[in-house]
Amino acid sequence: MEITADGYKTIHEPGTEMKICTFLWTYYGYPTACYEGQNVEMVRYRNGAIMARDDAQRYPEMDVDYVCGMPASGIPPAMGYAHETHTDLARPFIKYTPTWLRSFTPPNQEMRNQVARMKQIHVPGLIKDKKLLLVDDSIVRGTQLRETVDFLKQSGVKEVHMRSACPPIMHSCKYLNFSRSNGEMELLPRRIIQELEGNRGQQHLDEYANPDTERGQALLNWIKETMGFDSIGYQSLEGALEAIGIARCKLCTYCFDGKE
């Protein structure tokens, strides 16, 4: 349904079963809002704790000075991660609010890059000689990743580990305008897959989304080596669903797994 100043119109006839966008809790839901009884802020906090629990198995030797949330919706999962791992929480980046609210919403890449540069102000004392684990709500096009790492390296950071609070986004949303891309190849994982295997790789999206597969590891290694991270990890779809706490059949996961 589209609501305007003059009324509303039906874009798509309603289905027979409820399907709520999983990204609602991860990214664009307001922190104080509750959907189906699940508060956005608390879901994001649980999401970070679940990532930390899984990381303890995947990276048992990892040791960082600070867990850092990328403003603004990366902060709650960072808090959950820090609490679960008994690690200090820090804010090396402060959001500069008089810019575009979301860096992935401008229509062209040049403008997205400019917004990404403008929207963060750094705190040098929380970066130099520190080992940081950054948590962001999602990685859609990767607009900020390379510039963030380059900046941190230039500022003397010792290590940079990156975590995404949602699974790899493999499909452009076909239902909501807020996340529609000009094409699937604007999505970072799809571009990487095309570079690694060409069109053949696009037939194995499920494998690339799974870090326990050879293709999944290839995707992570590409991001790690190309972007300059010391490690990179995504929340699993199962972990995200666990954090939300609603039956999977009531949630839309199309952008992650392509299932309608």
List each language-model region with its residue ranges.
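PRPP-associated nucleotide enzymes
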Residues: 2-260
